[in-house]
Each structure stands twice: as structure tokens, then as C-alpha cells.
């Protein structure tokens, strides 16, 4: 296994930093940071996207019967399968639970109605957006990985650190 960069931080601070940066990258699609941090963030982001790709199709349809006004009605509910549930729990443990922000000129009630159904927006984005998109690319190209790219930028003015932008493709 490849050695991990220490990034000049204690272990707990380094892990928290990487967890925050990977979460922000996956949520926003783009992150500006130092080149060394970008390389570490890229490793983790690729790993988490691969976990989502390998399990996003695992669903189970269950029929539930509810009695409403004396009449029995059956409802089909789509649940996560065992593999997808394990992947979802792993991602929830590894990423921060970012919430959707209120849009401009959106009232509090509109915001609550819009976000009511989604409890973990970042995890849903991983399974509903990134996984199908990259799975289609993988099946079309026959190549796994390469979900992110690092673009080097100029040095930071204050300390001369090499900066980079990491992007989810």
C-alpha cells in the first residue's frame, strides 16, 4: 500500500482535513487546495466513487400493505440491497453529512418541502448522479478510475505553496 502524506499535521487533524476536503469536492465538484493535499484528496475521492459505482444497482423491491379507511392497499417500496446498504454506511462514516443550502429568494417552507425527502444529500448525489454517470463511462471505455483530475496552478502568494484545483470530471 502506498505511503500517505503527513501534510504537516497530527493524525486526527489530517484525517479531519481530508474528510472535509473530500466531502466538499464531491458536493461542489471542484476544490482549490495545495498540490500535496489534492493528491491525497484524489485518492480518497476515487475510492469512494468506486464504492458507489460497484453497489448503486443493488436494490430490492418490497410490497407493503397498508390499511387506509378500512381498505387494504399495497405499495411497492424500493429499498437498498445488502451491498448498497453496506456501501452507503461506509460512505456515511467516511464523509461529512453536508446539507443543501437555501436558494436565493426561497422561503423557509419552500426549502423544507424541497429537502424533506432527502436526508443525506451528499450520499444521494454519490449514488444517483456520480455512480450512474461514471459507470456508463466505464462500460463505454472499459477503463475504471480517472473520475477526478488535478490541474496545477500558480504558487500561493503568502508562503509559495504549490496550489492545485481538483475537479470531478
Q: What residue spans do the PLM features occupy?
A:
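Structured, basic alpha/beta domains of bacterial-type, RNA-associated proteins
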Residues: 2-6, 21-25, 31-35, 39-169
Amino acid at each position: 500500500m502506498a505511503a500517505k502524506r503527513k501534510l504537516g499535521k497530527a493524525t486526527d487533524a489530517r484525517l479531519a482535513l481530508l474528510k472535509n476536503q473530500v466531502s466538499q469536492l464531491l458536493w461542489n465538484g471542484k476544490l482549490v487546495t495545495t498540490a500535496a493535499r489534492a493528491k491525497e484528496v484524489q485518492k480518497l475521492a476515487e475510492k469512494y466513487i468506486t464504492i458507489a459505482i460497484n453497489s448503486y444497482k443493488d436494490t430490492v423491491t418490497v410490497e407493503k400493505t397498508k390499511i387506509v379507511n378500512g381498505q387494504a392497499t399495497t405499495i411497492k417500496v424500493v429499498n437498498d440491497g445488502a451491498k448498497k446498504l453496506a456501501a452507503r454506511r461506509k460512505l456515511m462514516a467516511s464523509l461529512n453529512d453536508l446539507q443543501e443550502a437555501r436558494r436565493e429568494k426561497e422561503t423557509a417552507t419552500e426549502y423544507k418541502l424541497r429537502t424533506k425527502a432527502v436526508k443525506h444529500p451528499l450520499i444521494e448525489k454519490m449514488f444517483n448522479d456520480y455512480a450512474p454517470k461514471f459507470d456508463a463511462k466505464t462500460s463505454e471505455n472499459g477503463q475504471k478510475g480517472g473520475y477526478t483530475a488535478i490541474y496545477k496552478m500558480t504558487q500561493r502568494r503568502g508562503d509559495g505553496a504549490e496550489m492545485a484545483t481538483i475537479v470531478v470530471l
